[in-house]
Amino acid sequence: MKANTKFIRTEILAGISSFLKATFYIIIVNPAILSEAGMPFSAVVTSTVLVCSFGSIMMGIYAKNPFIIALGMGLNAFFTYTAVLGLGLSYETALGAVFWAGILFLILSILKVRDKIVQSIPHALRYAIAAGIGLFISFIGLQNAGLIVDNPVTLVSLGSLKDPICLTFLIGLGCTAILISRNVKGAMIIGILLTTALAWPIGRWWGDASIVNFGVPTLVNYTGIFAMPDFSLFLKANLFGSIQYAFLPVVFVFAFTDLFDSLSTFVGLAEASGYKDEDGNPRNLKKSLLADAITTIFSGLVGTSSGTVYIESAVGIREGGKTGLTAITAGILFLPFLFFSPLLSIVPSIASSIALVLVGSFMMKPLTKINWSMPDEAIPVFFTMILMPLTYSITTGIIIGFLSWTLLKFFSGKKEDINPALLIINLLSLLYLWL
């Protein structure tokens, strides 16, 4: 009896750790990003909480793994800055694309073809895509904070360090980076709260116009703490409009990014924790991927970008989490925040920008696995990474990366590195660029 009690206590504490130290910040950051696409902040808070709770609980009950599902950083940036603001899709159409990406992900998982797809994509390009998305969201964070501004001559330049927004951002970024460097638990959420506290007097001194949170109540004039959940985004997805030919690349990128992000995360967590089956694969991988895919479908229906498994789940694993009870605990802890959208709305956009910049920096880690001494790999990797922020499009970076990889491998006499699946992807990429 004592052993069982200790086991349950350990699992619950691991779930609490995963929530507070690693994933809580997404409740603040995701609504801030998606509200830029014209979506109501309070409604995105509701959708974010429901997806995180639903996905994590499903992962715990169905897949029996201690992995947390939350809204993917990078996927939410692609949703807002590429699909809606870049390509001009309505957010309803973009939500439809999220839904169909989840359906595609689900089919690939059921038919067991996901392994063949993954094997067809060169490892170097997988790493480049992750790093490129990191550069992209970091660039967005720097723009939102006013550190990078438009320039008619050089396209971009450094913003004014005398600007209160930029100054507050730099102080908050520095404090958060120091906390992370010193391995302070919950450093990200502490940094966001510190920045919010600092922005309060600055917002008072310089007025509301200086600290703006994209159309929601500012630090100076907020409306309260509690409110009933806002379900106005439920079933708003344009399911049929999102499968027009012109929008199919958006569906592909959502599915592609979610698939590889999930697989790499599952593999990484399995390696770190030792949770593997007899074949050396991540424990209950198929069920975990199905839970991830169903959560993505659910995301599109309730009104937010794709949910995905979080590598930060390692926090709970380090605390002793071994079973689905850890994920279930974290999922339950999200639910009370359904009623806190007014309180969450007082967090300024510069605090969310700190999370974008730092999470983007974390996504550079896979670049250490690339053989930079081989030009036929290094050049496509560079193109993939650099074109995402410079063209403001994750899709463009992926497409140019695939095309340049195939071209250089072919003319380098390494045709064995070009497989049929890669050729099909290249053909589709050319059609997209041509049409």
What are these regions (language model features)?
Residues 1-43, 156-158, 192-286, 429-431:
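Helix-loop-helix hairpins and the membrane-proximal interhelical loops
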Residues 2-11, 36, 40-44, 69, ...:
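Membrane-helix interfacial "entry" motifs
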Residues 3-31, 51-52, 72-81, 85-133, ...:
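Helix-loop-helix junctions within the multi-pass membrane cores of secondary transporters/permeases
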Residues 34, 60, 64, 113-114, ...:
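Transmembrane helix-loop junctions in multipass membrane proteins, especially transporters and channels
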Residues 37-57:
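Loop-to-helix transition at the N-terminal end of transmembrane alpha-helices
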Residues 51-73:
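Juxtamembrane transmembrane-helix boundary signature
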Residues 87-201, 328-435:
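Membrane-embedded alpha-helical modules
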